């Protein structure tokens, strides 16, 4: 999932990031700049590849925290 994605799964991502203390600039189901910045911060803080894209490894880490 990357910038431009929309829908319930994006909203779930935003809710999880917010619950972990990351600012997504709202939980609206739209993967915009705020969500991308939050994903990048999460990736940096968790030793993941920093690309702003929520792939398998990023999802796995998010769901296991």
Locate predicted features.
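Structured segments of extracytoplasmic/periplasmic soluble domains
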Residues: 16-20, 42-46, 65
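Acidic, Ser/Thr/Pro/Gly-enriched interdomain connector segments
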Residues: 1-29
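Alpha-helical hydrophobic/aromatic positions enriched in membrane-embedded helices and signal peptides
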Residues: 24, 47-48
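Intrinsically disordered, low-complexity Ser/Thr-rich linker and spacer segments
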Residues: 1, 5, 60-65
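Conserved hydrophobic/aromatic packing and binding residues within compact polymer-binding modules
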Residues: 39
């Amino acid at each position: 999932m990357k910038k431009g994605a929309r829908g319930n799964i994006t909203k779930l991502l935003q809710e999880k990031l917010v619950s972990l203390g990351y600012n997504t600039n709202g939980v609206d189901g739209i993967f915009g700049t705020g969500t991308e910045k939050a994903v990048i911060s999460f990736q940096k803080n968790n030793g993941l590849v920093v690309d702003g894209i929520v792939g398998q490894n990023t999802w796995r880490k998010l769901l296991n925290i």
